[in-house]
């Protein structure tokens, strides 16, 4: 239990922020997971259409401070790379 009133306020604020951050990160991870499932299922046209949505979810989490901007850049790079690799292997066949 906090001893000071300000510490109690900070604890309440931190709890609200933790829940909001968890919401942003969860939405982002779900979008990435669904995107990866599309690529594994070889549904590349749908995956190509979903890429902007996935990127926006990642950037939204970074803009709200839920993840670091460098982590967002890395995740965007990886999902884009994943799609490009799948498209390239599909063209070779």
From Swiss-Prot:
Gene Ontology cellular-component terms for this entry are: cytosol; small ribosomal subunit
Keyword list (alphabetical) reads: Ribonucleoprotein, Ribosomal protein, RNA-binding, rRNA-binding
Q: What is this protein called?
A: Small ribosomal subunit protein bS20
Q: What does the record list as GO biological process?
A: translation
Per its UniProt record, what Gene3D superfamilies does this chain match?
A: Ribosomal protein S20 (1.20.58.110)
What does the UniProt record say this protein does? Answer: Binds directly to 16S ribosomal RNA.
Judging by the UniProt lineage, the source's domain of life is Bacteria
Q: Which GO terms describe its molecular function?
A: small ribosomal subunit rRNA binding; structural constituent of ribosome
Query: According to its UniProt record, which protein family does this protein belong to?
Result: Belongs to the bacterial ribosomal protein bS20 family.
């Amino acid at each position: 239990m906090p001893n000071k009133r300000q510490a109690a306020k900070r604890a309440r604020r931190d709890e609200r922020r933790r829940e909001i951050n968890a919401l942003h990160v969860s939405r982002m991870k779900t979008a990435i997971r669904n995107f990866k499932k599309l690529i594994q299922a070889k549904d590349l046209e749908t995956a190509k259409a979903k890429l902007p949505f996935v990127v926006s979810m990642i950037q939204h989490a970074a803009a709200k401070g839920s993840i670091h901007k460098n982590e967002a850049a890395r995740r965007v790079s990886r999902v884009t790379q994943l799609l490009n690799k799948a498209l390239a292997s599909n063209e070779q066949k």
